[in-house]
Amino acid sequence: MDFPTISRSPSGPPAMDLEGPRDILVPSEDLTPDSQWDPMPGGPGSLSRMELDESSLQELVQQFEALPGDLVGPSPGGAPCPLHIATGHGLASQEIADAHGLLSAEAGRDDLLGLLHCEECPPSQTGPEEPLEPAPRLLQPPEDPDEDSDSPEWVEGASAEQEGSRSSSSSPEPWLETVPLVTPEEPPAGAQSPETLASYPAPQEVPGPCDHEDLLDGVIFGARYLGSTQLVSERNPPTSTRMAQAREAMDRVKAPDGETQPMTEVDLFVSTKRIKVLTADSQEAMMDHALHTISYTADIGCVLVLMARRRLARRPAPQDHGRRLYKMLCHVFYAEDAQLIAQAIGQAFAAAYSQFLRESGIDPSQVGVHPSPGACHLHNGDLDHFSNSDNCREVHLEKRRGEGLGVALVESGWGSLLPTAVIANLLHGGPAERSGALSIGDRLTAINGTSLVGLPLAACQAAVRETKSQTSVTLSIVHCPPVTTAIIHRPHAREQLGFCVEDGIICSLLRGGIAERGGIRVGHRIIEINGQSVVATPHARIIELLTEAYGEVHIKTMPAATYRLLTGQEQPVYL
């Protein structure tokens, strides 16, 4: 490309060493207010000394405007012209990837035109080079300030995240964030190159009722829309609380039995991106939720409850900053295959998470190998009660000679942290009930200083009978409720729970498994699973609920003998 010839003063352009060091040009130490282009004293000249009048300068600007956008460097044998010097193209190749401004090769033509038009330039500053400070970047807030702009739920806890992604759900949105001017070229930790991604095995089919390819495009289920309601909830309540919220939403919307229930025929569109509610006739979107805003899905019989999260518009008080509340939009549907729809939504989440891992350059086979720091935290209801010194007490009973204590005892269950007798019932009007200090579920650890821990039930009953001839008895107990909550941390449905159930009663337990560590005991009857009562539930349904449960599984149990006594299936034997 030919460049126009520009008349110069006899002094010529500034002499420059093309083989000099490749650092950014450092201005003179003599700070003068004339111009930042002034040379050192005695120098050969500079751009500011060029004898260009106003007409020549205007002609130079017009010539530069006529040039194409991409300036190529001059021939190696020729001297650089002022335009190349100003844009950096006339210099030897320099490593200026981290430099930004009018002297960098990345500067646009508009910046250079502004330089040529300006009459006075501020003096340059000298000093050691300092790293560039992050420049503020104004982000565009979402159209709906009430809409939750969280990152997808499957992103949380991943070992590598997309660059620049931030979760704005846990703090107020200061839309002004600071980012570095130069994007680092090094890939984030854990990210893999495209060649490495190509070596990964193809993603396995996520188990579920739908085909993986169909979920990518979207699957439609028929249902009847009953209505919607709103609840206020914390961000991540336990599963039992979610289930209770789903039941509350169903009770609000669903008409009582015997009354007419207004409903609308709709189609539920489920994909790995969104969940939509479409009218059955015109296929118009009644509701449209991004998949990552769906917090919980519950199938209660033939009723399906879909819960989507939206952040409240008001700002919480400073003292409530750690407890941000959210609007839960609860949509209630009636469908014969409600359970199938709930499983399809869960499959869509799993497929979207698998797709996110591959797009983020994370080897799916390595996910879950290294447990998170909080994964080792285990909850045990018995341990909570036993470790509380307020629950350990001594009870003094006064009675008549020859009178029994008036308690019925059962075993605590194999695998219990405190293997001893449990008070299953109290005789009305007996010494134990009269004291008012004993209740059903209390663990009996000692009688008159004699320990009962570890003894079989028959030995414990014999020790109680021996107190019949006494008028004063001292009992050592640990106060416990009759129903114990076991929380099992099950990462996925493929992991073994580690116990067997027969007619709702736990009959065997894997020693050291997640169930035993969570508080499951042999001989206990399951009362509730994730907030859903299973007292009158068939055995097959209990197995189904346990098989599908994963994550944080809440199971309430009580000794089977206590359950039979309380429900009148057996008559208690008072001691």
From Swiss-Prot:
Residues 215-364 are annotated as: Required for interaction with NECAB3. One of its GO terms (biological process) is chemical synaptic transmission. GO terms for molecular function: amyloid-beta binding; enzyme binding; enzyme inhibitor activity. It is found in: Cytoplasm, Perinuclear region. PROSITE patterns: PDZ (PS50106), PID (PS01179). The gene is APBA3. Residues 1-10 have a biased composition (Polar residues). Residues 156-184 have a biased composition (Low complexity). Residues 1-50, 118-211 are annotated as: Disordered. Composed of an N-terminal domain, a middle phosphotyrosine-binding domain (PID/PTB) that mediates binding with the cytoplasmic domain of the amyloid-beta precursor protein, and two C-terminal PDZ domains thought to attach proteins to the plasma membrane. Residues 217-381 form the PID domain. May modulate processing of the amyloid-beta precursor protein (APP) and hence formation of APP-beta. May enhance the activity of HIF1A in macrophages by inhibiting the activity of HIF1AN. It comes from Homo sapiens (Human). This is Amyloid-beta A4 precursor protein-binding family A member 3. Gene3D superfamilies: 2.30.42.10, Pleckstrin-homology domain (PH domain)/Phosphotyrosine-binding domain (PTB) (2.30.29.30). Residues 143-153 have a biased composition (Acidic residues).
